[in-house]
Amino acid sequence: MNTLGSGLKIIGSGTAIADQSLTNQDLSNIVETSDEWIQSRTGMRQRYICSAQENLASLGVKAGQKALAMAGLQPEDLDLIILATSTPDDLFGTAAQIQGGLGATRAFAFDITAACSGFVVGLNVAAQFLRTGVYQRVLIVGGDVLSRWVDWSDRTTCVLFGDGAGAVVLQRQAQDNLLAFEMYTDGTGNGCLNLSYQANPQPLTAEKTVAQGTYQAITMNGREVYRFAVAKVPEIIEKVLFKAQLTTSDLDWVILHQANQRIMDAVGDRLGIPSEKIISNVGEYGNTSAASIPLALDQAVREGKIKEGDLIALAGFGAGLTWAASIVRW
């Protein structure tokens, strides 16, 4: 609970979708798969991927602009921009590119990497700047361009991932609408889901080498990721509800990382939460990593599902292994 006499509220949200739709039928022309095979295992019908003219920064700028418009703010009103991503356009950071693209000249900007938990982690990090009074308004962008790093010959992974970005604007206020949060890491499970650097040693002199190389395509142990998610996500949601002195019946909505419909169904069943309270758009967008939760959140807000005062559980989980959850009041 906040003990500093200062809280925060989400005052705007926005999304940006990549410009190319890739359907299950399209994928069946690339690898040995079918619409029935993909839908029965993942719930996905299509996903969107970036063309050569798009990148993470352009998606982040578009999502940020929409979030600012909903909030009724100008880019110059922002104090801080946090980008959650695992697929930056530049390894030195992409948040600064988004800051420049928005024209948010007053805002400090930095990247964080926490894979599919990244947006929730970014929300919890931003909250600390607001609660202490250091900043008044923060833009959080969750975005990934995973199509760059997919092995398009591997049908177990290439069917899963899409590209996109989602954003929210947080503003400091007296009442705290972030009621509780939890974050965890288990590095012993790191090998379950990877986008790894592979070094190729190159000689500099007769005695010295340098490990130059590149990143390899995404690899995943799907069975282990499923076991991890259905065990840890219900547990962390129960923990944040306990911290907030709430129960599952108090929740109006649950927004999970949109990894796979089977995982979301299993989490809902274990918590006894009706499926109509669990927001899902995985069928339309696939797994967009750090973008998935803000994409689902913004869509539900704009469709009029989420209303002022609603209690929402957000939970992300993924590579690391990391998992994080928050309870927010809209």
From Swiss-Prot:
GO terms for cellular component: cytoplasm. Its main location: cytoplasm. The keyword Transferase applies. The keyword Cytoplasm applies. GO terms for biological process: fatty acid biosynthetic process. Its EC number is 2.3.1.180. Residues 258-262 are annotated as: ACP-binding. It comes from the Bacteria. GO terms for molecular function: 3-oxoacyl-[acyl-carrier-protein] synthase activity; beta-ketoacyl-acyl-carrier-protein synthase III activity. Gene3D superfamilies: 3.40.47.10. It is an enzyme of class 2 (transferase). It catalyses: malonyl-[ACP] + acetyl-CoA + H(+) = 3-oxobutanoyl-[ACP] + CO2 + CoA. The last Arg residue of the ACP-binding site is essential for the weak association between ACP/AcpP and FabH. Belongs to the thiolase-like superfamily. FabH family. Catalyzes the condensation reaction of fatty acid synthesis by the addition to an acyl acceptor of two carbons from malonyl-ACP. Catalyzes the first condensation reaction which initiates fatty acid synthesis and may therefore play a role in governing the total rate of fatty acid production. Possesses both acetoacetyl-ACP synthase and acetyl transacylase activities. Its substrate specificity determines the biosynthesis of branched-chain and/or straight-chain of fatty acids. This is Beta-ketoacyl-[acyl-carrier-protein] synthase III. It comes from Synechocystis sp. (strain ATCC 27184 / PCC 6803 / Kazusa). The lineage of its organism: Bacteria, Bacillati, Cyanobacteriota, Cyanophyceae, Synechococcales. The gene is fabH.
